[in-house]
């Protein structure tokens, strides 16, 4: 059978919090089968757990948060969640000694390295996939996102930014998902923001960890980062990274096709909740052997050479 995945060992790293600008220690621990993805704040006494759950997601101006019934939150979970989706990690405990996951370089790549360094362990329990049976679509003005039946995981994302640094030919990206394609083509794409917005937020005591080290920063005319872009279409690739993380908030890799126009965290989450609420539109499936399973979800192989 195709088995659930966790880590082989504990792995730890430090980084900076996007909101506070302070050092954050991140510890990722193996977890038993059927635990799911659990974020944990150890700066609170007693520590507070936040299971990854579409209904717990709140989208703020700066990041995605998970919020519990007491309005306690953990922030900036989206890029780490994308790395978990990319490598198909089903069960993990993620501890931070702060109200937020460190922003690292603004992409999912540092988290991918950490997870691969810890190693991936298969558990003796069947991995459950969420497979689309019907198309579900959500809209917000001219923005929209949909999931439809497809034997694999295919993503097609279009952005529409009228900015000199973002050429019109680099505003759409399509991906046939696999662990390898995620690591090579998506995980390194960084988040982005306007210099004027960062300066304004920092003047109000917000976004204190925001810098050229953790984002693509643009002014009205150009990219300000000395090293430029990692991909000519890095902006849309990062929006796809966000979507992969947002959709994994259900705790399961999705078998289906995701298509979006100008979508963001809030609309991605609205789509996921709409799918989950329409029980006839999806089903959980398991696979007895690799031959039955879509190629998209084969265990990561060549990514270690990346």
Curated annotation (Swiss-Prot):
This is UDP-3-O-acyl-N-acetylglucosamine deacetylase. InterPro entries: Ribosomal_Su5_D2-typ_SF, UDP-acyl_GlcNac_deAcase, UDP-acyl_GlcNac_deAcase_C, UDP-acyl_N-AcGlcN_deAcase_N. Pathway: Glycolipid biosynthesis; lipid IV(A) biosynthesis; lipid IV(A) from (3R)-3-hydroxytetradecanoyl-[acyl-carrier-protein] and UDP-N-acetyl-alpha-D-glucosamine: step 2/6. The keyword Coiled coil does not apply. Catalyzes the hydrolysis of UDP-3-O-myristoyl-N-acetylglucosamine to form UDP-3-O-myristoylglucosamine and acetate, the committed step in lipid A biosynthesis. The active site is at 265 (proton donor). GO terms for cellular component: membrane. Its cofactor is Zn(2+). Zn(2+) binds at residues 79, 238, 242. The keyword Zinc applies. Belongs to the LpxC family. It comes from the Bacteria. One of its GO terms (molecular function) is metal ion binding. Keywords: Hydrolase, Lipid A biosynthesis, Lipid biosynthesis, Lipid metabolism, Metal-binding, Zinc. Its EC number is 3.5.1.108. GO terms for biological process: lipid A biosynthetic process. The gene is lpxC. It catalyses: a UDP-3-O-[(3R)-3-hydroxyacyl]-N-acetyl-alpha-D-glucosamine + H2O = a UDP-3-O-[(3R)-3-hydroxyacyl]-alpha-D-glucosamine + acetate. SUPFAM superfamilies: Ribosomal protein S5 domain 2-like. HAMAP family: LpxC.
């Amino acid at each position: 059978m195709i088995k659930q995945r966790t880590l082989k060992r504990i792995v730890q790293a430090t980084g900076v919090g996007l909101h506070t600008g302070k050092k954050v220690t991140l510890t990722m621990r193996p977890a038993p089968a059927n635990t799911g993805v659990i974020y944990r704040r150890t700066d609170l006494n007693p520590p507070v757990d936040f299971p990854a759950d579409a209904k717990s997601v709140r989208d703020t101006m700066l990041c995605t948060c998970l919020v519990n019934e007491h309005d306690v939150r953990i922030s900036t979970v989206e890029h780490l969640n994308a790395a978990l989706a990319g490598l198909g990690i089903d069960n993990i405990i993620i501890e931070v000694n702060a109200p937020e996951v460190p922003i690292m370089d603004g992409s999912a790549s540092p988290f991918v390295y950490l997870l691969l360094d810890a190693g991936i362990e298969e558990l003796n329990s069947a991995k459950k996939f969420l497979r689309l049976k019907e198309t579900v679509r959500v809209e917000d003005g001219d923005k929209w996102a949909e999931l439809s039946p497809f034997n694999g995981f295919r993503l097609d994302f279009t952005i529409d930014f009228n900015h000199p640094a973002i050429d019109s030919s680099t505003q759409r990206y399509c991906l046939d998902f696999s662990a390898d394609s995620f690591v090579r083509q998506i995980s390194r794409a960084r988040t982005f923001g306007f210099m004027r917005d960062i300066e304004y937020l920092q003047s109000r005591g917000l976004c204190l960890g925001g810098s050229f080290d953790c984002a693509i920063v643009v002014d009205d005319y150009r990219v300000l980062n000395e090293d430029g872009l990692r991909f000519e279409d890095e902006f849309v690739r990062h929006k796809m990274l966000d979507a992969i993380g947002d959709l994994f908030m259900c705790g399961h890799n999705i078998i289906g096709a995701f298509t979006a126009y100008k979508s963001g965290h809030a609309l991605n989450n609205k789509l996921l909740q709409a799918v989950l609420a329409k029980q006839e539109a999806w089903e959980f499936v398991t696979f007895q052997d690799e031959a039955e399973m879509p190629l998209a979800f084969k265990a990561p192989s060549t990514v270690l050479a990346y």
